[in-house]
């Protein structure tokens, strides 16, 4: 008879413990209920990009000396640098520079180690296309400056949102 009573007491203790855990979880859920939502409506509202955001790479053709440091420091040897040696002035002349953003991991090593600072990271992150071959950017496409997200009047950022009155 005693084993049955102890089993019943253990069952009661386990039930109380389970109810306490459920109550604790419910209290945490209720504490998050009166916070403002974190999600945004993406195409119409955009977050403000941080200063160190690693987006699309911007390339300045005139500054590049075709040293290929960017290719050597890239973990996947991604930038394609075509150059020709000018024998009369004994310098390399850059012919073509391209990066395939379908393969790029946006590590930023090429930007960090470039001796002439001809590469920089922009805040542009909308690179989606229907064809993966469109992600192979040459020096002309890499040289385009992105339109700033904050200055675009058609897009509401977190700063321009109307305040919610409670």
From Swiss-Prot:
Major subcellular site: plastid
Keywords, in A-Z order: 4Fe-4S, Chloroplast, Iron, Iron-sulfur, Membrane, Metal-binding, NAD, NADP, Plastid, Plastoquinone, Quinone, Repeat, Thylakoid, Translocase
Subunit details: NDH is composed of at least 16 different subunits, 5 of which are encoded in the nucleus.
Family membership: Belongs to the complex I 23 kDa subunit family.
Protein name: NAD(P)H-quinone oxidoreductase subunit I, chloroplastic
Domain 4Fe-4S ferredoxin-type span(s) in chain numbering: 55-84, 95-124
GO biological process: photosynthesis, light reaction
Enzyme class: translocase
Record's keyword annotation contains RNA-binding: no
Chain sites annotated for binding [4Fe-4S] cluster 2: 74, 104, 107, 110
This protein's encoding gene: ndhI
Coiled coil spans: none
Cofactor binding: number and manner: Binds 2 [4Fe-4S] clusters per subunit.
Enzyme Commission code(s) on record: 7.1.1.-
Subcellular location(s) per record: Plastid, Chloroplast thylakoid membrane
Entry GO terms, CC: chloroplast thylakoid membrane
NCBIfam families on file: ndhI, NuoI, PRK05888.1-3
The reaction(s) this protein catalyses: a plastoquinone + NADH + (n+1) H(+)(in) = a plastoquinol + NAD(+) + n H(+)(out); a plastoquinone + NADPH + (n+1) H(+)(in) = a plastoquinol + NADP(+) + n H(+)(out)
Cofactor: [4Fe-4S] cluster
Organism, as annotated: Chamaechaenactis scaposa (Fullstem)
Gene3D superfamilies (alphabetical): 3.30.70.3270
């Amino acid at each position: 008879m005693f084993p049955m009573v102890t089993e019943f007491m253990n069952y009661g203790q386990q039930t109380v413990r389970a109810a306490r855990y459920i109550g604790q979880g419910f209290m945490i859920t209720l504490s998050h209920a009166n916070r403002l939502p974190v999600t945004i409506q993406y195409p119409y509202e955009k977050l403000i990009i941080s200063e160190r955001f690693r987006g699309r790479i911007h390339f300045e053709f005139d500054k590049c000396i075709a040293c290929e440091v960017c290719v050597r420091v890239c973990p996947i040897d991604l930038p394609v640098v075509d150059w020709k040696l000018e024998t009369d002035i004994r310098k390399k002349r850059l012919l073509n520079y391209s990066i395939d953003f379908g393969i790029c991991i946006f590590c930023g090593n090429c930007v960090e180690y470039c001796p002439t600072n001809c590469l920089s990271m922009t805040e542009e992150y909308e690179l989606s296309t229907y064809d993966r071959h469109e992600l192979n950017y040459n020096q002309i496409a890499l040289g385009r400056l992105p339109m700033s997200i904050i200055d675009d009047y058609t897009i509401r950022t977190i700063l321009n949102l109307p305040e919610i009155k409670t």
